[in-house]
Amino acid sequence: MTKEIVTKAQERFEQSHQSLSREFAGIRAGRANASLLDRIQVEYYGAPTPLNQLASITVPEARVLLISPFDKSSIKDIERAINESDLGINPANDGSVIRLVIPALTEETRRDLAKEVKKVGENAKIAIRNIRRDAMDEAKKQEKNKEITEDDLKSLEKDIQKATDDAVKHIDEMTANKEKELLEV
């Protein structure tokens, strides 16, 4: 029962890491990457649909994304969704495909994006600390209900703290890598 708390916390830590990875994938680094478009929803026949379900997305050049809709009639809807997104990239529609040329990042934009990365990383660490608090509360509740001894509680708290430290370290590494990627010219 006691190790179950640590295991559950570690699973939630892993979900936070995956969420952070998805968040970082959406922050463009001056290079074309299909994951930039993961969060774009297209209004398709009245329902919001993820762009990657409506088109194939390829990277023919370092700073170009090519979007080939499966249904050519959806091209205007896809173009509108990209224009309305917060990407800041203008799509070029040639009737059958959409080209997205990723502009080179200015030094100022790079610094702004690096600040954004730090903020997102900090929010992920807050989520980790909340998960730790929940796990610690659960352990204390079990000790209070006499399900575990005080020694078990201390051991459990130590295990939870170690898992938390590992999770925070991983977030710090992910944040540092993304910042480095952004600040590379």
From Swiss-Prot:
Domain of life: Bacteria
A molecular-function term among this protein's GO annotations: ribosomal large subunit binding
InterPro entries given in the database record: Ribosome_recyc_fac, Ribosome_recyc_fac_dom, RRF_sf
Compartments (UniProt record): Cytoplasm
GO cellular component: cytoplasm
An example Gene Ontology biological process: translational termination
Keywords: Cytoplasm, Protein biosynthesis
Signal peptide limits: none
Pfam family, one: RRF
Entry function: Responsible for the release of ribosomes from messenger RNA at the termination of protein biosynthesis. May increase the efficiency of translation by recycling ribosomes from one round of translation to another.
Family stated for the protein in its record: Belongs to the RRF family.
Protein name: Ribosome-recycling factor
Organism: Streptococcus agalactiae serotype V (strain ATCC BAA-611 / 2603 V/R)
Encoding gene (name): frr
